Amino acid sequence: LAQLSGRTLGHLTRGRYTQVTLDTELNPTVRQDGAREIPVEALSHGARDAFYFALRAALAQELAAREPLPLLLDDPTAHFDEERRGSLVGHLEDLAKDLQVILLTHDRRILNQVREAHVLKIGTESSASDSTRKIQIRR
């Protein structure tokens, strides 16, 4: 789990953090090659989000070998720059080959980066008399 998440984290952080360590109580730390361990809480928001994505993706891949379960992600790119967002989309597309990926996001830029998606758009239309929910599905 640590090795697989470390590879993904290294890719998402452009090689800045390449190793993940989990102690006996599963407390995570990250490190650069040959550098000291850094608690995840000390990372920037973007690096922390990248770490948690890498860990969830690694766990989903390990579990998929036994029983594929959907991977549900809620706005994983909130603190990502465009390059890191593109890297994450690439990982999601790789994961989607073996398991169902459900991504909840308000970031419309992701739609321009994915090759294939089923989009469920939920919004609100208001009129003077009532408020109704509208749902659009796009392939």
Label every PLM stretch briefly.
Residues 1-139:
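Terminal ABC-like ATPase head and other globular end-domains that cap long coiled-coil arms
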